[in-house]
Amino acid sequence: MSAPDQGYGQYPPAGQQYDQQQQPYPDQQGFEAQPGAPPQAGAPPTADGRKKKRNYAAGAFDVGTGANVAPGAGPPMPGQTPQYGMPPAGQPAYGGFAQQPDPQAPVYGDPSQQQPQQYGAPMASPGQPGVGGYQAPDPYYTSGVGAPGAPAGPGGVAGLTSNLAGMQLGPGQPAQAPAQQQARPTPLNQLYPTDLLNQPFNVSELDLPPPPVILPLNSSVTSSPMANCPPKYVRSTLNAVPTTHSLLKKSKLPFALVIQPYAALHDHEDNVPLVQDQVISRCRRCRSYINPYVVFLDQGHRWRCNMCNLTNDVPQAFDWDAAEQRAVDRWQRHELNHAVVEFVAPQEYMVRPPQPLVYLFLFDVSYAAVSSGLLATSARTILDSLNRIPNADRRTRLGFIAVDSSLHYFAVPKDGDENAETSMLVVSDLDEPFLPVPQELLVPLTDSRQRIENFLTKLPEMFQNTTNNGSCMGSALRAGHKLISPLGGKIVVLSASLPNVGYGKLDMREDKKVLGTSKENSLLQTANSFYKSFAVDSSKNQVSIDMFLFSSQYQDVASLSNLPRYTGGQTWFYPGWNAGRPEDAIKFASEFSDYLSSEIGLEAVLRVRATTGLRMSSFYGNFFNRSSDLCAFPAFPRDQCYVVEVAIDETLGKNVVCMQTAVLHTTCNGERRIRVITLALPTTTNLADVYASADQCAITTYFSHKAVEKALSSGLEAARDSLQSKLTELLQTFRKELAGGSMGGGLQFPANLRGLPALFLGLIKNVGLRKSAQIPSDLRSAALCLLSTLPLPLLVQYIYPRLYSLHDMPDNAGIPDPETSQIVLPPPLNLSSERFQPFGLYLIDDGQTQFLWVGRDAVPQLLIDVFGVQDRTQLRVGKGSVPELDNDFNERVRAVISKSRDYKSRGVGSITVPHLYIVREDGEPALKLWAQTLLVEDRADQGMSYQQWMGTLREKVVQ
C-alpha cells in the first residue's frame, strides 16, 4: 500500500480540526501539521553555548546502527504531509528536539560491539540525516505504508476500497446515513491499516496526542481555540461516536471517558478560568451548564440546550457586570469560550456552611512503628510541613490519636492558654471508645500552632521505649470517625503493623504455598467486612481515609485498601520501609509533605451529563456511587483519574454530541465551586471512522480498571484471560469488517491502535496481574490500587515503562532546550533486552520505581564520570542515587533522572518520588531479575515475549 495522503496523528486542514480555528493544545506542540510551510532540510543545529562533551577516545563507537537506531523517521519530502508517528518538517523529532549529530563528540562504548538488525528495530535509511547520532528508519515504518517490496496501490481507506471490492468503506462507497442524520460536512480521521508483524509498535508512538477531534465548522458559538476539552482533563476511548448501539456493539470497542478533573496538585499550577459573578445558567430540564456548544435564539434572549434541546431563558445578569455596574460583552464570558471552567457557587449550592479542612492523624505507636522510625519520621514531616498545609482561611483543624493496643488521645490547648498543657488521655475500652474532650481534640492550626509544634517534637519520645505489639487501628478509625463526622474531613492512617485487636481485627493469612494458584484470589479479597461497611458510613458523613502502610511483614493491604477505595482516598504502600536507610526516609518525607500541601476538594460530588441518547452506565475509581449517576467524594484528590462507561440508548441524530462533567466541591479555603468540563465529539455511521478515531491509551486505561474489577471478583486468571480475549476480539473484528477477512501472513490493525497489543501485554505482565508464585499478596494489592487510580500518562508508563539509553544519548539530551528551558529526555526504546549493549548505561522507569542498569562491560571512564568509581565491583548496588560529580556527563544523567520525575510538565499531579535502584548486569541476581520483569517484550516469569504474544494473537485471530 502506498503512502496515504493524510497521516494519522496529523491535524486536518485548516478549518476542520476540533472546531473552527482551534490550535493544538500547548502540551502537544510538535504534532500539528503546518500546511504551506516547506520542510527544512535536516534538523536544527544544536544551540550555541552547549556544554562540550568530554572525549572518551577508548570507548567511542558508532551508534547509528543496530538496536540504537532511533525510533522515529526523517522529515517528509517537500509536498508531503507528515505521517503517523512522524513530526512535521522542521519540527523536533524526539521529545520535541531534533539535532544534528556532532562528529567530534564520541560516546561511551565499544566499537566492536555492532549488533545485527533486530526484530522490531527500524532499519537504517541511507541518505537521511541522523538525529542526535541516531539514523531515521524508512518512512514505511511509521506511516502505515507497505513494507519494501509491497505492491503499490492507492493509500488510506481508498486503497482498501479499491482492493476489497464490494465493501462499503471509505470515500469510494460511503455508508448510507439514516434519514434523521444530517449529511456530514467534514471528513473525519482516515483509517490507515498497518501490519503488526511487519510494522511493529514503537514506544515513541505513546507520546503522540490522541486522534484529533474533528468537529463541523461553527459547532461552537465562539471561535475560541479552547472551546473543546483538552485531553489532559477528559479523553474519550472513541473520538468519533457511533450513532447507534448496534454499530458500537459491532465495533467491539469500548465507549468510555477517562476523567481527570485536575491537572496539578495546586490551583496556581493549572489555571482554569474562574466565573466569579455567581451568574450560573443551567438547563431547566437536564441541569447542564451553559457551554460553548449551546445555540442562542430570539435575539440572544434564549438558549437551546445542546444536551436535551430544551430552550431556556438567558439570565438577565448574563450581560451585566454587577461589580462594575456596566454592560459586558457576552462573547467574552469564560463559559462560552472555554470547555473547562470553574464557577463560584451561590448559596443554593450549599447544604450547610462550607466545611473547614480537617486532618486527623492516626499514628501507629506499636513496637514495629517505633523501631522502624516511622513515628519519628512522620511526626517530623508534619512539623516541617505545617506551613504547607492549606490554611488561607485560617480555619484548618488538626487532631492526633496514637494507636497500639489502646487509644491515646491528645488534647492540645490554644497558644493563648498559658495554664494548660497538652495532655494524653488513654482509652482501653475498644468496643465503645468514648471521646474524652472533643472540643480540644480537633484544634485550629492557626490558634494552636506553637502547642502543635511542641507536641510533634515530643511525640516520638513518649513511645520510644515501647514493647507493645498491638494495633487496634479498626477501633481507632471508629473513634476518629466519631470525632470528625460532625465536620467531615480526612483521616490519615500511618501504620506499620497488622490490626490485631479490637474492631476490624485481621489475621495473618499470607501463605506462600497458595501464591500463583487459584487459591491466591482469596488473599486479594477483604478478610473483614468491617472495612467496606465502615468506609461507606464514612463517605456518608464526608469523612475520607488515606492509608500510608509500611509493614515489613504481611499487613493485609487487600482489606485496608477498601477504606480509601470508597471514600475518595488513596493507599500508599512502602514495603520493608526503614528510616535507617536515608533513601527510605527521604522518599516518604518528600511524598508525605507534598501530600499535606496538596489542595483538595471537600464535600464533593461528580456527575456526567450527556446529549440525549447517551447514558453513563458504569463508574470506576475511588469514590462511593451514591445513586445511578452521582459519585460522592468526601475529599476530592488531585492525583487520580476516573473512568465512566457510556451507553448508547437511542439513535443519535446530531453530527455532534457533548458530554459534560461537573464537580461540585468546597475548596480548601471554604469557597463552594463547580468545575465544569465539556467535551464535544463528532458522530459517525461508518465503522472505519470509529476505528480511525479510537484512542489506544484511553482504551488501555478503561481495560485496566475493568481488569482490576475482574481480578477482585473472579480472580487473576480470569482477568488475564479477559484481556487476551478482548484484544483477540478487536483484531478479529477489524479483520472481518475492515480488512476484508484476508490478512495473508500478517496481522492488520489501525496505525492509531498499533500499541494496543504491547500495552495489553504490559498489563497482563504487570505485578498486579501477572502469573507468578513469587509476588506477595500485599504487593499485588498495592499494584491493583495503582492500576485503578493512576492518571492516564502515569498509568500507561506503569504498564509499559520507559527505557532510556544514557551512555549514547543525543548531544542535546540532559540539557535544557534553548526555547522551552525544559530538560530534553533521550528517545525512549522498546522494552526488550535486545536493545541493551553490554557496555551500556540504561534507565528503566515505570513511574513508581527506577532502575539504573550498568552493563557488564561498561568502560572505566563511564563509571568514573557517573558514579566516581573505577571498577564495577566498587559500585554500590540497590537503593541509592547518582552522586553529584563535577563533570558534564554526570550532570546530564542526573538531569535526565530528575526530568523523568517531572509530572507537572505532563499535565498530571502526583506526589510520587520513585526509588532509584543501581543494578549491575553481573551483580545481585534478585535485583537484576526484578529490573528485567519491567522489560515487557522479553519472556520472563511464566509470561510470554512480545513475539510469542503476537504469534498467539495471530493464531487465535485466524482460527
Curated annotation (Swiss-Prot):
<dbReference type="GO" id="GO:0000149">
    <property type="term" value="F:SNARE binding"/>
</dbReference>
<dbReference type="GO" id="GO:0000139">
    <property type="term" value="C:Golgi membrane"/>
</dbReference>
<comment type="similarity">
    <text>Belongs to the SEC23/SEC24 family. SEC24 subfamily.</text>
</comment>
<dbReference type="InterPro" id="IPR007123">
    <property type="entry name" value="Gelsolin-like_dom"/>
</dbReference>
<dbReference type="GO" id="GO:0005801">
    <property type="term" value="C:cis-Golgi network"/>
</dbReference>
<keyword id="KW-0968">Cytoplasmic vesicle</keyword>
<dbReference type="InterPro" id="IPR006895">
    <property type="entry name" value="Znf_Sec23_Sec24"/>
</dbReference>
<dbReference type="InterPro" id="IPR036465">
    <property type="entry name" value="vWFA_dom_sf"/>
</dbReference>
<dbReference type="GO" id="GO:1990753">
    <property type="term" value="C:equatorial cell cortex"/>
</dbReference>
<dbReference type="InterPro" id="IPR029006">
    <property type="entry name" value="ADF-H/Gelsolin-like_dom_sf"/>
</dbReference>
<keyword id="KW-0963">Cytoplasm</keyword>
<feature type="binding site">
    <location>
        <position position="305"/>
    </location>
    <ligand>
        <name>Zn(2+)</name>
    </ligand>
</feature>
<keyword id="KW-0813">Transport</keyword>
<dbReference type="GO" id="GO:0005789">
    <property type="term" value="C:endoplasmic reticulum membrane"/>
</dbReference>
<dbReference type="InterPro" id="IPR036180">
    <property type="entry name" value="Gelsolin-like_dom_sf"/>
</dbReference>
<feature type="region of interest" description="Zinc finger-like">
    <location>
        <begin position="283"/>
        <end position="308"/>
    </location>
</feature>
<dbReference type="Pfam" id="PF04811">
    <property type="entry name" value="Sec23_trunk"/>
</dbReference>
<feature type="compositionally biased region" description="Low complexity">
    <location>
        <begin position="165"/>
        <end position="183"/>
    </location>
</feature>
<dbReference type="GO" id="GO:0070971">
    <property type="term" value="C:endoplasmic reticulum exit site"/>
</dbReference>
<dbReference type="InterPro" id="IPR050550">
    <property type="entry name" value="SEC23_SEC24_subfamily"/>
</dbReference>
<keyword id="KW-0256">Endoplasmic reticulum</keyword>
<keyword id="KW-0653">Protein transport</keyword>
<keyword id="KW-0333">Golgi apparatus</keyword>
<dbReference type="InterPro" id="IPR006900">
    <property type="entry name" value="Sec23/24_helical_dom"/>
</dbReference>
<dbReference type="GO" id="GO:0030127">
    <property type="term" value="C:COPII vesicle coat"/>
</dbReference>
<comment type="function">
    <text>Component of the coat protein complex II (COPII) which promotes the formation of transport vesicles from the endoplasmic reticulum (ER). The coat has two main functions, the physical deformation of the endoplasmic reticulum membrane into vesicles and the selection of cargo molecules.</text>
</comment>
<dbReference type="InterPro" id="IPR006896">
    <property type="entry name" value="Sec23/24_trunk_dom"/>
</dbReference>
<feature type="region of interest" description="Disordered">
    <location>
        <begin position="1"/>
        <end position="135"/>
    </location>
</feature>
<dbReference type="Pfam" id="PF04810">
    <property type="entry name" value="zf-Sec23_Sec24"/>
</dbReference>
<dbReference type="GO" id="GO:0006886">
    <property type="term" value="P:intracellular protein transport"/>
</dbReference>
<dbReference type="InterPro" id="IPR041742">
    <property type="entry name" value="Sec24-like_trunk_dom"/>
</dbReference>
<dbReference type="GO" id="GO:0008270">
    <property type="term" value="F:zinc ion binding"/>
</dbReference>
<dbReference type="Pfam" id="PF00626">
    <property type="entry name" value="Gelsolin"/>
</dbReference>
<keyword id="KW-0862">Zinc</keyword>
<dbReference type="InterPro" id="IPR036175">
    <property type="entry name" value="Sec23/24_helical_dom_sf"/>
</dbReference>
<dbReference type="Pfam" id="PF04815">
    <property type="entry name" value="Sec23_helical"/>
</dbReference>
<keyword id="KW-0931">ER-Golgi transport</keyword>
<feature type="binding site">
    <location>
        <position position="286"/>
    </location>
    <ligand>
        <name>Zn(2+)</name>
    </ligand>
</feature>
<dbReference type="InterPro" id="IPR012990">
    <property type="entry name" value="Sec23_24_beta_S"/>
</dbReference>
<feature type="binding site">
    <location>
        <position position="283"/>
    </location>
    <ligand>
        <name>Zn(2+)</name>
    </ligand>
</feature>
<feature type="region of interest" description="Disordered">
    <location>
        <begin position="163"/>
        <end position="184"/>
    </location>
</feature>
<comment type="subunit">
    <text>The COPII coat is composed of at least 5 proteins: the SEC23/24 complex, the SEC13/31 complex, and the protein SAR1. Golgi apparatus membrane; Peripheral membrane protein; Cytoplasmic side.</text>
</comment>
